[in-house]
Amino acid sequence: DEARLSGHPVLPRMMTGHALNCRAMALRCAADVLHKPLADCRLIVLHLGGGGSARLFIGGKMVDGVRDDEWMFAPERMGGVSLQPLVAMCYSGAYTKQDIMDLIRGKGGLMAHLGTASAQEVEQRIADGDAHAKLVYDGMLYSCARAIGGLAAAADGRVDRIILTGGLAHSRYVTGYLTQKLSFIAPVEVMAGEFEL
């Protein structure tokens, strides 16, 4: 369907990443918070750990999503970047294919900007007055909020809840930032950790 189309037919969008935990959190929110079946809910779930993804559930089905190699970056993921500079890097002769793959997954995101993927370390640096750490961390969270805003548009603006899950949902800094950015769309529910079915 239209959610799987990209700008080129040989590169369809992939709907992978944290699907089990996102579905488990959607089911839990539907039952425990909204008191109705998932089939009757419109939910957006953001999973944020070392990587990240966001999923849109409508009618009990995962109908759209954003991976951490698309719009948003994460502690170890590069996220959405301008393609022309990336292609130039690939053909510069300075990087192997594995080097590029490592930059995308494992050495991207907070790791690339700050030399660590530890949210606790970054938050301590922010508390100690590191303005660059705050800029990068807030930039990562901004990219997550932007991705969720896109999924809200795909849901025609009708969303019952936005669920924050994954390891970073334990952080008050993270949940506070995202709640401030997203609560105009729908109430934000924090369901930290992972509970895969």
PLM regions: where:
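N-terminal Rossmann-like NAD(P) cofactor-binding subdomain of oxidoreductases
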Residues: 1
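Glycine-rich phosphate-binding loop plus the immediately following alpha-helix
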Residues: 6-43, 50-51, 63-119
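Short beta-strand scaffold segments in enzyme catalytic cores
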Residues: 52-57
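Short acidic-hydrophobic catalytic motif
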Residues: 60
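Adenine-nucleotide phosphate-binding core of ATP-dependent small-molecule kinases
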Residues: 102, 106-157
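Claisen-condensing/thiolase-fold acyl-transfer catalytic domains that form or cleave C-C bonds
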Residues: 144, 171-172
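Short glycine-rich phosphate-binding loop at a beta-alpha junction
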Residues: 156-168
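Conserved phosphate-binding/catalytic loops in two-lobed NTP-binding clefts
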Residues: 172, 176-197
